[in-house]
């Protein structure tokens, strides 16, 4: 008996989504947006710890029907939600292949957020947490500012403008048949 890997065939099959699957992803994205755009801004505030922000996110996800588990087709990339990082905590080193890091709950659980790190006034809070409905994920990194829009420093405004430009270019490249790895490169 000779065994042969079928990973490539499975990856090709998973790359093409049916309308049924696309609807699951759209529903997941709509619920994810509701949590980040509507629910969280009403519930989080400066003075909260990263962990408390993460817990607030988790409560909202479950209340909206999310499963809480993110499964991705890569080694070591099955995780529970993600990160809430206040200010420079987001540059904390991590093994995760994503835009954000954080100290986490403890060295053994480098996710969610740290209970001792507080979100200060006039500071950034970055949340890189996914959403899953029935096995279909959406992922989004959301940045909040704890102050009036006119108090955002120039360097942060410029960095945001670059991020928006990258987002728009990437979105324009995402068309049926496009290979995400080619866009990522």
Regions found by a protein language model. Give the residues of each.
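Active-site neighborhoods and metal-handling regions in enzymes and metal-associated proteins
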Residues: 1-185
């Amino acid at each position: 008996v000779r065994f042969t890997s079928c990973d490539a065939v499975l990856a090709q099959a998973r790359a093409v989504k049916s309308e049924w699957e696309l609807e699951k992803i759209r529903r997941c994205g709509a619920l994810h947006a509701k949590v980040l755009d509507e629910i969280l801004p009403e519930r989080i505030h400066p003075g909260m710890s990263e962990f408390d922000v993460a817990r607030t996110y988790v409560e909202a996800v479950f209340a909206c029907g999310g499963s809480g588990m993110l499964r991705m087709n890569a080694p070591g990339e099955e995780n529970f939600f993600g990160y809430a990082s206040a200010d420079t905590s987001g540059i904390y080193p991590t093994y995760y292949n994503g835009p954000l890091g954080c100290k986490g709950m403890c060295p053994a659980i480098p996710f969610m957020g740290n209970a001792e790190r507080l979100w200060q006034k006039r500071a950034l809070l970055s949340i890189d947490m996914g959403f899953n409905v029935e096995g279909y994920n959406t992922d989004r990194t959301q940045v909040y500012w704890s102050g009036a829009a006119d108090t955002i420093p120039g360097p942060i405004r410029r960095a945001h403008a670059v991020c928006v430009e990258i987002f728009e270019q990437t979105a324009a490249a995402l068309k049926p048949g496009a290979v995400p790895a080619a866009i990522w490169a």
